[in-house]
From Swiss-Prot:
TM segment ranges: 33-53, 77-98, 113-133, 178-198, 226-246, 288-308, 320-340, 347-367
Species annotation: Cratogeomys goldmani goldmani (Pappogeomys goldmani goldmani)
Any one GO biological process: mitochondrial electron transport, ubiquinol to cytochrome c
Name of the molecule in the record: Cytochrome b
Cofactor(s) this protein cannot do without: heme b
Amino acid sequence: MTIMRKSHPLMKIVNHAFIDLPTPPNISGWWNFGSLLGLCLILQIFTGLFLAMHYTSDTLTAFSSVTHICRDVNYGWLIRYLHANGASLFFMCLYIHIGRGIYYGSYLYMETWNIGILLLFLTMATAFMGYVLPWGQMSFWGATVITNLLSAMPYIGQDLVEWIWGGFSVDKATLTRFFALHFIMPFIITALVMVHLLFLHETGSNNPLGLPSDCGKVPFHPYYTTKDFMGVILLLTLFMTLVLFFPDKLGDPDNYTPANPLNTPPHIKPEWYFLFAYAILRSIPNKLGGVMALAFSILVLTLLPYLHTSKQRSLSFRPLSQTLFWMLISDVIALTWIGGQPVESPYIVIGQVASVLYFSIILIFMPIAGLIENKMLKL
């Protein structure tokens, strides 16, 4: 078998990626989330495939087909809730993965980091289109509000919105194309994940110290396969507890009402994993400004390699930057909370302050903290 995995063309690829891959000896549990994201992607593709076998992308029957899956299909309720809550699990792992990348300076691997940001955009687009498919109240109004934001673009905005809708409002054409795109996107994401891993394996993994670890690297198997397997068991235990005991905890009750274009819900909001960006969008009184702030809330991550001023890569030995990092995490949590609240005082002001703080920490305070820490090293 040893000869086979080192000589066979296909086995060689697997061997270099998952068995004999030289890995730093000191990477912590925060590095588990890459493999957990792979697990989430596989889970979403398989559950989505089985759901697509029974779903109909028609405005008259979409809601009924989801009900049919839950009531009449063998274990359909389980497949549906695995898929719906699997999206939440995916984003939880994704945000922790990005947070770890920021904390330990992994963004300095620029190709890997930028492909990761592209993956985040595609995953967000896929999740948004998936949320529209059950054709409940929040699905319909969420699709209407979010796609309508593109009309803020000068000159081409309204034409672009109508092109996406396939008509003059969100209707059958919109639902059909969203279903087609939602089905194909995970396979595009999978291809990009391969490229993400390719670039990562060119440089090797980062480690908590942010120092080169070439002299002490260990093979990925059995050390990190065992460690990743432990992470998988823990995560699946928590995930199955959520799916089997609290399947609707993260959903919106309005989505159990069929879509009605004549009745607007009192408070239109996306799923919890988009609320931080939604809060930033709402905090700008101008429509175009809000859309630009929404896009920049993710695009700002591409600037991190250029804003890195410290002589140290990781935040492990940088108390000032650590404080700012945890302030940023607290701010994102506050924005998530604000995004779920109605547009009224005091939530409007809190959202605006939190939005300004979000961009200030990333663009101003963290680069300044890096320069101050460089000065402190010379004392």
